[in-house]
Structure formats: C-alpha cells, structure tokens
Curated annotation (Swiss-Prot):
InterPro entries: Lysozyme-like_dom_sf, Transglycosylase_SLT_dom_1. It comes from Escherichia coli. SUPFAM superfamilies: Lysozyme-like. It holds the Pfam family SLT. It comes from the Bacteria. This is X polypeptide.
Length: 169
C-alpha cells in the first residue's frame, strides 16, 4: 500500500514540476511573465491539469488555463484536441499563453487585456466590469506570487509594462 501511495505522489509531483517548467518556457516564448501565466492558471483552475469549467455562453474551459471550447475548431487545425488540453499540462499552458498574447497584441500589455483572457473583447459595460473583476483577482494572485519571491510590485491596475520588466531583474 505504501509503495502505491509513493508512486502516486511521485507521479503527481512530476506532473507539477513538469507544468512549472512549462510556465517558464511559454513565458519565454510568448514574452509574457511566467508568474502572470501562473496567476491566471491559479485563478482559472487552481493548477488542476484536468479541470473542466462550465461556461454557460460558450461551452466549457479545459485544463490548467481553462482554454475555452469556442477555440477547439481553430486548435484542431494545429492537431490540438480537447483531450490534449486536460492531459498535457505544457500544451495547455502554451495554448493559454497563445490566447493571452493575442489579447496583448489587440489591447496592449494592460490589465484590461488580462481581463479579456477570461471575459472577451466585447465592448459593453457588463463585459468591462467582468474584465475588471477578473483582472483584479489575477493581479492579487500575481502580486502574491511575486511577493513570495521577495519581489515588490508597483501599485497599478492599468498597465503591465513595469511588472513584466521585473522578470528581467
């Protein structure tokens, strides 16, 4: 019994370590602070690789970064299927980083773009409030991650450039 428990624990630890490296790699490749990706993943799934979250409008989100099912047709063109997103942590993290990079390209490196990762780009007051609430939650998680590493974050809710430059220090 103890051997089985040890084997299960080692598999779980291996998966977490593997995913941790992927935050760093995806952050490097998409030029996004890996800790921001970690903060989004914590907000979206509490770091659960196989998480499924119901979205009443578009269907559901999959995996660590809760990649929305509305993107599945596009992802299928690249050979990514829904099962990959709940079984391959790196695939999920890279896919989430890809969609966050799209938001940054569209709206700049702003907290509004972080909010759009979850609430979309529709320009209505309701969506704006949803983006703000989401970005505020991610910001709190992000500053907690940075604080645990002894890094102070400038107080801002508007722009990420100063924060993203922290990763280079």
């Amino acid at each position: 019994m103890k051997k089985w428990m040890l084997a299960i624990c080692l598999m779980f630890i291996n998966e977490i370590c593997h995913a941790t490296d992927c935050f760093d790699l995806a952050g490097r490749d998409y030029k996004i602070d890996p800790d921001l990706l970690r903060a989004i993943s914590w907000k979206e799934s509490r770091y659960r690789v196989n998480a499924i979250g119901i979205n009443p409008v578009t269907g559901y989100g999959s995996g660590l970064m809760q990649v929305d099912s509305q993107h599945f047709n596009e992802l299928a063109r690249y050979g990514i299927n829904p099962e990959h997103l709940t079984t391959d942590p790196c695939m999920n993290i890279y896919t989430g980083a890809y969609y966050l990079a799209i938001a940054f390209k569209k709206w700049g490196i702003t907290w509004e773009a972080v909010g759009a990762y979850n609430a979309g780009f529709r320009k209505t007051e309701r969506q704006n409030q949803r983006r703000l609430a989401y970005a505020s939650d991610v910001y709190r998680i992000y500053t907690g991650i940075k604080s645990s590493k002894g890094i102070r974050i400038p107080v801002t809710k508007k722009s990420l450039p100063e924060i993203n430059s922290v990763q280079n220090n």
